[in-house]
Amino acid sequence: MPTFQQLVRSARKPHAKKTKSPALQGCPQRRGVCTRVYTTTPKKPNSALRKVARVRLSSKFEITAYIPGIGHNLQEHSVVLVRGGRVKDLPGVRYHIVRGSLDSIGVKNRNQSRSKYGVKRPKS
């Protein structure tokens, strides 16, 4: 416990909040170019082939981003929009690719949660 005089000399410093998505540098999204598109396996109890992409952002960061949804059209040199948001069972994946924006098309035959996967309202 500091004395009153010690607090007068130098006030208490507030804790600096550490961002969970530093590559975005405070922006909601960033544009980037895919340098590698591949699949990877999740941590233990889960088993799958998760689709991820290595992306070079406009902020000069090289990150790993998750490709959500079933099926995608991304390949090397595809221009994508990246948002924050980690994937709990993939270590080191702290970003998501935004579907239906730039070179990434929306998910085919998606009828529920369409806005999350870049799908327009179906004609009925």
Curated annotation (Swiss-Prot):
Region (Disordered): 1-28
PANTHER family named in the record: 30S RIBOSOMAL PROTEIN S12 FAMILY MEMBER
Basic residues composition-biased segments: 10-20
A Gene Ontology molecular function term of the record: rRNA binding
Assembly description: Part of the 30S ribosomal subunit.
Cysteines paired by S-S bonds: none
GO biological process: translation
Cited Gene3D superfamilies: Nucleic acid-binding proteins
Subcellular location: Plastid
Lineage top rank: taxon: Eukaryota
PROSITE patterns linked to this entry: RIBOSOMAL_S12
Protein task: With S4 and S5 plays an important role in translational accuracy. Located at the interface of the 30S and 50S subunits.
Protein name as catalogued: Small ribosomal subunit protein uS12c
Alphabetized UniProt keyword annotations: Plastid, Ribonucleoprotein, Ribosomal protein, RNA-binding, rRNA-binding
